[in-house]
């Protein structure tokens, strides 16, 4: 074998080794990238499953709470449709009892169209605490002071502040408002309102509503720690934070989240 032949063979062998090394390195790189992608996908899948599980749990809790407003609305519309509307005092008693039995609810309230309840608004004009000067029945049973008490609903004719009334009035559907701050026992808490229409013969009569403080929900979600260092947040249908580890973001627009995160 000549020196030239030996040199060529050596170079071919060296080149083959280099190619093999490059192929091995590329294989390792592809394998690493695949592993990283698989790990990322697995993490995303796990996070989505956790979110779906928590969402289902919260949905169940909220449905149980909100059913009370719908149940009262259905009872009132049933009696009204039968021609035996309950007295205002009976409705007051029912809402007070409901509030006592649902400690996680801040308040129950009801507002009827003029003379829609019993045609006696003029008799009740200015008779506090369940009426204002119009005589419309508009009690607001609440525990904002720390004790259960009733006062007349306000701002029901103020645009923006009366969505809990005008939206069910127009859509004939329930509404769950975006969170907003409200003072309870001297301190400000985040609250959402659920309002359901009272319908008789397909005609809007009024609403039954409840205010739900989001503190309990906030505390429950604060215990959810995906992968030990993550956090869970709840965004309302209107795109506002109903729950977030950063209290400063509560009730604020969730405009930093990606569209995928809001799906």
Language-model features: locations:
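Conserved beta-strands of PAS-like sensory domains
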Residues: 187-225, 236-237, 243
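Conserved beta-strand cores of small sensory beta-sandwich domains that regulate signal transduction
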Residues: 70, 109, 231-233
């Amino acid at each position: 074998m000549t020196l030239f032949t030996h040199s060529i063979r050596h170079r071919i062998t060296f080149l083959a080794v280099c190619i093999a090394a490059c192929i091995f390195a590329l294989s390792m790189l592809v394998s690493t990238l695949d592993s990283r992608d698989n790990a990322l996908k697995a993490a995303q899948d796990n996070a989505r499953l956790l979110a779906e599980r928590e969402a289902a749990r919260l949905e169940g809790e909220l449905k149980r709470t909100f059913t009370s407003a719908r149940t009262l609305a259905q009872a009132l519309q049933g009696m009204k449709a039968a021609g035996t509307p309950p007295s205002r005092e009976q409705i007051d008693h029912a809402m007070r009892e409901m509030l006592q039995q649902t400690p996680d609810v801040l308040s129950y309230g009801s507002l009827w169209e003029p003379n829609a309840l019993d045609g006696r608004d003029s008799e009740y004009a200015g008779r506090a605490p369940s009426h204002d000067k119009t005589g419309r029945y508009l009690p607001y049973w609440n525990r904002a002071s720390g004790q259960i008490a009733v006062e007349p609903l306000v701002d029901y004719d103020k645009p923006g502040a009366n969505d809990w009334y005008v939206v069910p009035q127009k859509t004939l559907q329930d509404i769950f408002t975006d969170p907003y701050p409200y003072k309870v026992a001297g301190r400000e808490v985040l609250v959402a309102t659920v309002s359901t229409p009272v319908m008789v013969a397909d005609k809007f009569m009024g609403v039954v509503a409840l205010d739900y403080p989001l503190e309990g929900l906030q505390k429950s979600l604060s215990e959810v720690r995906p992968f030990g260092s993550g956090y869970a947040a709840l965004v309302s249908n209107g795109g506002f934070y109903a729950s977030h580890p950063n209290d400063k973001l509560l009730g604020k627009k969730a405009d930093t989240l990606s569209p995928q995160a809001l799906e």
